[in-house]
Amino acid sequence: MAPIELFQRVAATVPAYAAFLREHGVDAASIRTEADFATLPFTTKDNYTRRHPLNDLCRDGVLRGMIAVSSGSTGEPSFWARTADDEKVIADRFAQVMDGFGRRPTLAVVCFSLGTWVGGLFTLACVRHLQDRGYPITVVAPGNNPAEIARVLPQLAPLAEQTVLFGYPPFVKDVIDTLDLPWASYHIKIVTAGEVFSEEWRTLVAERAGIADPVRSFASLYGTADAGVLGNETPLSIEIRRHLAARPDKAREIFGADRLPTLVQYDPAVRYFEESGGTLLFSGDNGIPLIRYHIADEGGLIPYREMLDRIGFEPAQQGPELPFVYVFGRSRFAVSFYGANVYAENISVGLEQPEVNRAVTGKFVLAAPEGADGLHVTVELAPGQDPSDDLAEEVAARIVTHLRRLNSEFTHYVPERKQLPLITLRPYADPGDFPPGVKHRYVR
């Protein structure tokens, strides 16, 4: 993407951005080089999109297309406009994923929330664009309704050669764990968005769904309501991530953190990424065009060749020669305990170990009350599982073992006598901590 050309077009045609530039004393004609572009002030929800009427944020000040609502996971919901042309650009990312799965008769099952929320209808629209391109795909959209999924899959999945589940990671796992369906016979593939997950999670879900090759049967999408899908996992990025997951020191050297980020590849022809202070900015020509938009995602950029030079092995997977972007779970999904930042991703790995993973769902709530004798972790039990002291002790042991392995701050900052977490086991779908049908909050 040519950022200067995009900037000049947005400055000339988007009323809100023209006003933003005037407010910051920027003369659009003075922005001629990428160095000039890098001096432009960041745009954010607070200083830009929430300060202007929705139509003024659109091209030519005209609101058109479909309106989506962000999940509100970091605050109040926001509204975003997207046209069919915008969807067609994003559909290229879906095409790359589906090409990786193989072009054969496919049932696509949209398990994201439907309605005004961005995930379900946007995914449905992109899959329909693939149908228009000749992909042999049939799509059904039961949304995040397990009963409806159980009703349609037995009838439709046997008619296809593979079934692709599109959904939020914890929901997809819940569906596979709780619905008594012959998953292996459906030749399942899984596409997720909305949450960082561990490689232990990928392996566990693959085993339960009868997936033989987790590298070529999964894809996580990195996206936002603001701009749609920004990047996607490829078999190459998954192989690299799985290699680094088993080598925390090497991962720390490359990513500079005690947690494993989502690792995807992106197309610089349609998304312009920048890194600033360990966070990501992007620019793109969407239904609401955005310039140097700061979405508070922690992460960074690594060019394709640099990544292959740094990982220390020769990947078996051939991948597109596209740059990598890595994205951590947001810092608000962490707690500070004795000065150590403990991330939700660190806790997840412990719950995905074979000693406990059939007794729990993988969902939890992490807290570090002032003066506590240990981290407080409230864990959701699997359906039909009763709580017990023995299980709580085993969960605590798995969590602390992998916290020490993955998080050097925790190991060195937290006194050993306070490293064992305090576990509370709650029933499946407990309305207080684990209400069904809503996006789960891991830190409260």
Model feature map: region roles:
Residues 1-107, 159, 373-422, 426-444:
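Nucleotide 5′-phosphate-binding alpha/beta core
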Residues 5-9, 133-444:
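Active-site glycine/GP-rich loop and adjacent strand/helix microenvironment
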Residues 16, 117-118, 147-148:
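Short alpha-helical
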Residues 75-82, 105-113, 135-138, 186-187:
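Short acidic, glycine/Ser/Thr-rich loop/turn "cap" segments at secondary-structure junctions
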Residues 85-91, 118-120, 145, 167-168, ...:
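Phosphate/oxyanion-binding active-site loops and adjacent basic polyanion-contact surfaces
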Residues 86-88, 126-128, 209, 238:
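A glycine- and small-aliphatic-rich helix-loop capping segment at beta-alpha/alpha-beta transitions
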Residues 95-130:
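Conserved AMP-binding loop of ANL adenylate-forming enzymes
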